[in-house]
Amino acid sequence: MIDFPIKYRLIKKEKYTGARLGEIITPHGTFPTPMFMPVGTQATVKTQSPEELQQMGSGIILANTYHLWLRPGDELIAKAGGLHKFMNWDQAILTDSGGFQVYSLAEKRDISEEGVTFKNHLNGSKMFLSPEKAISVQNNLGSDIMMSFDECPQFYQPYDYVKKSIERTSRWAERGLKAHRRPHDQGLFGIVQGAGFEDLRRQSSHDLVSMDFPGYSIGGLAVGETHEEMNAVLDFTVPLLPENKPRYLMGVGAPDSLIDGVIRGVDMYDCVLPTRIARNGTCMTSNGRLVVKNAAYAEDFSPIDPECDCYTCKNYTRAYVRHLLKADETFGIRLTSYHNLYFLVNLMAKVRQAIVDDNLLEFRQDFIEKYGYNASNRNF
């Protein structure tokens, strides 16, 4: 049996759902699951220091392979001693494969069996990313958890296109495994694709599980499908994945989607949502989203969320944070970003406790009622 550098330990299953409490052991420490991972696109979580992330309970963060490959370059980061030393973060790091950014950011993509040729979005130069190159870059970055190179087809692509795509992604996964130079200290995850097609998700899962990765990611969701469609895909995909390995739902950060993913047995999540909306003054609170820049809060001297015990809510008022944002002061974005990240990391801590108490469905109902989900804030 292979001794993987990434190990999943199941602690408890929730009595009434597929939720599971566990922990993931990595070369840079152990973190509890289910866990939300803050995204540090450019080797930094926007406006936050590593110490602040540790204080809020983030045992793992995500960094983007595509961005770091282009700037400052994976070889420079390797010279610095790897990503952990480069950014002074001593806990776990997960890197994506770069594939999603190639499809979403780069211009003039050309996908072939060999890989993807594209135009660099920074300077317009022609570049090529293959399964082997994606692994090589991540080996240089030195992340604890790496991703296989995959194609992320749009959710509503035609069946025939998605079928060809997942079959190529499986071949790319095999090539990536062969190219992996550091299997002893970096765990490589396979990414299950298949859009909304159950048989294609089954085919993709079967292919990847047969390759015996140390963990599995569910890709191709949170790309425009409805909340109900996402849940349906999870309902038929998660049971196809091994129980003794981590399950990671990529790119998901809306609070109800996190809880619904946990109910279906998912362990890990990431999303830029909390920091992206924070820059526009939108805050997640126990009673739903709050746009603190609105004039209604100009003389509101209460915390952003009276039920939150984060640094922002313990020390500053809505009126002050609004003033900072209106004055274009960076500190305002730091405060809203910290609050939103804390909100999701803390939400996962509450979810873990609900699993311990076997009352996750009750917790979900209470949360959804208070958060006030409706058509206008479904994605927040």
Curated annotation (Swiss-Prot):
Required cofactor(s): Zn(2+)
Catalytic activity reported: 7-aminomethyl-7-carbaguanine + guanosine(34) in tRNA = 7-aminomethyl-7-carbaguanosine(34) in tRNA + guanine
Active site: D96 (proton acceptor), D270 (nucleophile)
Keywords: Glycosyltransferase, Metal-binding, Queuosine biosynthesis, Transferase, tRNA processing, Zinc
Residues binding Zn(2+): C308, C310, C313, H339
Subunit structure: Homodimer. Within each dimer, one monomer is responsible for RNA recognition and catalysis, while the other monomer binds to the replacement base PreQ1.
Record function comment: Catalyzes the base-exchange of a guanine (G) residue with the queuine precursor 7-aminomethyl-7-deazaguanine (PreQ1) at position 34 (anticodon wobble position) in tRNAs with GU(N) anticodons (tRNA-Asp, -Asn, -His and -Tyr). Catalysis occurs through a double-displacement mechanism. The nucleophile active site attacks the C1' of nucleotide 34 to detach the guanine base from the RNA, forming a covalent enzyme-RNA intermediate. The proton acceptor active site deprotonates the incoming PreQ1, allowing a nucleophilic attack on the C1' of the ribose to form the product.
Protein name: Queuine tRNA-ribosyltransferase
Family named by the database record: Belongs to the queuine tRNA-ribosyltransferase family.
Gene this protein is translated from: tgt
Pfam families: TGT (PF01702)
Any one GO CC term of the record: cytosol
This enzyme's EC code(s): 2.4.2.29
Gene Ontology biological-process annotations: queuosine biosynthetic process; tRNA wobble guanine modification; tRNA-guanine transglycosylation
GO molecular function: metal ion binding; tRNA-guanosine(34) queuine transglycosylase activity
Region (RNA binding): 251-257, 275-279
Binding, substrate: D96, S97, G98, G99, F100, D150, Q193, G220
Cofactor note: Binds 1 zinc ion per subunit.
Pathway in which the depicted protein is active: tRNA modification; tRNA-queuosine biosynthesis
HAMAP family: Q_tRNA_Tgt
Species name: Streptococcus thermophilus (strain ATCC BAA-250 / LMG 18311)
Cystine crosslinks: none
